[in-house]
Amino acid sequence: MKRLFLSFVALALLAGSIAACGQKGPLYLPDDEKAKKEHSKDRYGF
């Protein structure tokens, strides 16, 4: 029973850490073409 509980806790922590990944910052839609070009790629240029 203890092993099952520890497995569940480990799975929950793993899922939480994966869900926390992603871009940070405000979400918005750029209004003009210049802003669209500047922000079309992510921060690291991939």
From Swiss-Prot:
Lipidation (S-diacylglycerol cysteine): C21
Lipidation positions, renumbered (N-palmitoyl cysteine): C21
Main localisation: membrane
Annotated Pfam families: LptM_cons
One GO cellular component term: cell outer membrane
Leader sequence segment: 1-20
Membrane topology note: Lipid-anchor
InterPro entries: Lipoprotein_LppL, LptM_cons
Domain of life: Bacteria
Keywords: Cell outer membrane, Lipoprotein, Membrane, Palmitate, Signal
Record localization: Cell outer membrane
NCBIfam families: SS_mature_LptM
The name this protein goes by in its record: Lipopeptide
Organism per entry: Pseudomonas aeruginosa (strain ATCC 15692 / DSM 22644 / CIP 104116 / JCM 14847 / LMG 12228 / 1C / PRS 101 / PAO1)
